[in-house]
Amino acid sequence: MDTCSQESEPLQTKESPINNAGKTPLVLGNGKLVTPHKQAAEMTPNCYTSETFKSPLNFSTVTVEQLGISPESFVNNSSGKSSPYLKKSRRRSTVGLRGLPETNHLIRFVAEQRSLKNASLTQTSPFQGSPALYRNVYSLREQMSAFHLAFNSIKENEKMTDCPEFSEAEGVFKTRGSTKKESLGECQLSEFSAQSSSKRRRLSSPSSSDVNLTDAVDLQACGVNMAACPSTDMKCAVETCAGLSQKSSASGLNLQCGCLMNESPLLSELTEASSGIQDAASVEERGSNDAVSVDKCTEVSTDTAPEVRSLVTPLCQKDLPSSKTFVLRSVLKKPAVKLCVESLQEHLDNLYNDETCPSLTSSLANSCKEQTAALPNTKKRKRVTFGEDLSPEVLDESLPANTPLRKGQTPVRKKDLSSLSPPLLEQSPVPEWLPQPNFDDKEENLENIEPLQVSFAVLSSLNMSSIAETLSGTDTSASSSNHENIAPFRVGRATRTSDRRSKLISFSQESVCNLLNAEAQPCKEKKTNRRKSQESKHADKVLPRKNRVLKGCKKKKGKGKRKGVQKSLYGERDLASKKPLLSPIPELPEVSETPLVGSLVRRTYPDDFNSNGKFEEMMLPKRENLLSQDPEDWQVIQGFNKDNASESCSSDMKSSSSFSNATFEQDANINSIEMDENENIPKAITLESENERKTGTECENSHISCTLVTVTPVVSDNPKPDFPLQSQELSAAGQNVENLFQIVKISEDMNIKCEKQSGFSVIPEDKLQTEHLIPDSQKECDCSEDVLTDQRKVSKSQGEDLGRNSAASCSGVSDRERKYRGHSVGGSDGPGLHLERTNNLQTSYSMSSLVEISLENSELCKDLSDSIEQSLQRTKSETKVRRSLRLQKSLEREGGLVWVSPPPPPASCTSQRTKRRTVGTLDSRGFEPVSSRQDPCTLPSTSSEENGEGFTAAPDASLPGKRRRRSFCTSTLANPKSTTQSRGCKRRSFLGQKRENTLQETSRESDLSEN
């Protein structure tokens, strides 16, 4: 009742600051948020509740107002202010929060109800009915008293009639407990922990025999705190420890020793005394009650320890110091199992020294064998058993791994234990086996701690006679030799080291173990080696791929940022994917045409061999190695019309050098594509073959170059020719852009070269033409023309037959011109011809070539000059297209993407040319290098007239090389400009399909050239 009044005061004190609080909201200790406007509404209910709380509330009849809850507590009476505090207060409810008075009283009410239920069972207890113990639990005194009362009330009341002395002692404890526990400031137990522990023990106390070791340890702490008081209070503390439960430190030992525990505390005391574990604690406590305990021993525990009855009093008289030490140890160290065993050992040592009861020591040893062995079993999680527990020495580190037990024998540890004679066991049964671990000696630490489990199990399993029989001289000698090194108090004990040595001496297991080790270690090494090898292989397989992927990503990022990409960067493209059809880049009609091209190439080669014989064989290797061939060889081949053709080529190269440099990459790619397409067009091939025949005759007259100028300029000077065709063009027209004059001849020569290089065009006419060209004189003439024709070969893949003869000469010229790579398709007139070329060719050649062209076809020359001028005047094309070169077999080495700029239609001629640009049609040789794209590997596409930078549409079409070579990257003569400007950065879009008229015109022009 006083507690309620005491609580009302702090509530008022907490509420008092509210009156002094200004207009600012305050958070009270009870958790309520109070604002100035809520003061008047909330103060009165709080005062009212404080008065009502003086008496315990009956929650069956209590109202909301009594608890201080009103509608105002849920509604915020704001004065127009919208502060964040007010907003939060609207969303908050203080009902049910921890620390509120109504919540606290509700908790107390529940506690009282529980206490009332238990009151019927504990009516005799003086303090059980008082609610003060439950209400004012914040003080240490009430916490301790409530704990003990809750734990002992039921048990003590049941046994009250049997032991009046104990009830009196309990009353003494309860009277003195308050004062005694006030002095113990160390034991600051929380209310929750005390109640929860009391509940646990209240449930477990009736069946004390099934108490867990953890509960015993927890209770031991409580009992120790009580026992740690002055000697005057020891009796009360110890009696409570014994009376409360056998769960104190001794109770854990009772369970360990396997002694039967009855519900009565007296029986627990008797069993403890019989086991010699808690005799120390019971001595001080009982004092004059020794006789009573002896009587109880005789009554209760006759079956457990009959010898102990007469020995209880002397034990009590003798073990006062040991009991003190035991209590102190239990206070300092919580693990009671080992400490209790140590106390038992000390007690047994004292008994043995006084020679009072040897039989007791033997009985104690026998009783504790299995009990102490059970403890380490629970602690050890992993055990290796062969039908029974093995000694740790079987698995000892010093012994070899996988030490087998001999067939029919128990673990060696048993024989080692047998080294102990029966008198030794009686003299020091336990203390030798359970000493306090010495952490200084690592080996002894292991020896002292681990063998507990096995040692007792072995002692229990073996008979003394069998032990004596199994002993051998080697064992005793080894053990004696080992005992010399042991401290004198351990002389009678066989250590693990001695057992090890005795094993090694008495048994020949060492050799066997070594053999097993020798076998086991290689196996382990093999396994480890295998694992390492597998890991290394796995790392080799996986890690490089990741690295490659990362590198590829970096490269792709770098490429994507660059607009103008050099073909040299794409040299690694072949390694990434050698199969063009699997490329992620969509290929337009060329993909479908490539198989046809391959078949055509195969057809042309045998046809070429049949028609040309040896000459064909010479040309095929040239196709492959044109780039590698020396320019001097080509110059020798050119011999016939070297002057005329070289002049024209030089002029073309000079004029086209600027274009070739710019359009080098683009034209190479485009021309290679055009070559493939042109191969697919048999009609264009036939026209080209006719043109080549004409050009063959013209080459001899050195006028063919002029007519051939109309052939689309071959930008074979471009980067390294990946494809043999482009390489020949580079080599033959080393200045691949010289296409104007060279292309004029190239139109014919390119047809020949196209046949030579890849035989792209399957033309019987070409074969016939090649037969005509087979003569050396024609070859020489063609060689001079082939300087141009090499470029035209790049542009014209179809005109193979005539080009073969001229290709030999052209290939030589192309090698010579390789030195002058970077040539653009030069216009036949003025600026285009006068464009500076990196090559050292003289401008006089260009002039002479122009003259020749004008002599043969003045119209064609005009067209070429116009186209060249237009291409020079053109600015960089706005649009750019990427072109893939991988599908062309001639360009396999330099696969990749090239930016090509589609040139605007320059003039009627250029527009016609752009129209002629086929989307891979099979008409003419399929490649109109109208754009004068310099692809070292690509053959200049379309007719020789178109290949000429002038590329007049009609006259160019007349040339055999003009046979419509619709290339993906078809571009007008302006393309050389665009290529020079964008240079591999722009891609040309597909223009209109070839007109049939252009084919007719090409045939007509070829007829005119032949005439």
Swiss-Prot record:
Signal sequence, start to end: none
UniProt GO cellular component terms: chromosome; nucleus
Stored InterPro entries: PP1-bd
Superkingdom of origin organism: Eukaryota
Coiled coil: none
PTM text: Phosphorylated by CDK1. May regulate its subcellular location.
Residue span(s) of domain PP1-binding: 380-440
Low complexity bias (residue ranges): 418-431
Regions of compositional bias (Basic and acidic residues) in chain numbering: 522-543, 790-803, 993-1011
Positions bearing Phosphoserine: S125, S130, S209, S293, S310, S391, S398, S428, S583, S702, S747, S967
Region annotation Disordered: where it falls in the sequence: 1-26, 395-438, 522-544, 790-835, 896-1011
Sites of Phosphothreonine modification: T313, T403
Bias kind Polar residues: ranges: 1-22, 931-945, 968-983
Function: Regulator of chromosome structure during mitosis required for condensin-depleted chromosomes to retain their compact architecture through anaphase. Acts by mediating the recruitment of phopsphatase PP1-gamma subunit (PPP1CC) to chromatin at anaphase and into the following interphase. At anaphase onset, its association with chromatin targets a pool of PPP1CC to dephosphorylate substrates.
Subunit structure: Interacts with PPP1CC.
Family annotation (PANTHER family): ANTIGEN KI-67-LIKE PROTEIN (PTHR21603), CELL DIVISION CYCLE-ASSOCIATED PROTEIN 2 (PTHR21603:SF16)
Official protein name in the record: Cell division cycle-associated protein 2
